């Protein structure tokens, strides 16, 4: 379940009549580290991108994430939206981190021009750990990758739930001029 901060506009075609590709940034915000993930330009798949050190208050963190967003907006693929992991307990109650994420979303919303979505992140770290453990046996080698992998899980959950597959995949009629 996601909570939307502003509309996510999706333009199916650009001015040349070809499919308009969209990219999203996924974020797993923690007290020590911030995991970042990116979707592919088609908006179908996520991948871990990088991990940032989280130090300072939410304004400092928002500034740091804002710099990453500015860099992504300047690239050819652009950025259609930001997906922030929204922490909840298994029963749905807020955690001690929920208010911090909501405050970060509010701060980011004031400083960036792209929509922000809060996406349920329950069990995302466990799923990311499980996925990494299949490829990397040593915990010390997995640990630095965990936050970005968790962000990729959160982002993939959002991408999977945002539109039916038929709305996201080009058919033969989309390939004709």
Region spans (language model):
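Phosphate- and other anionic-substrate recognition elements at nucleic-acid/protein interfaces
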Residues: 2-27, 31-177
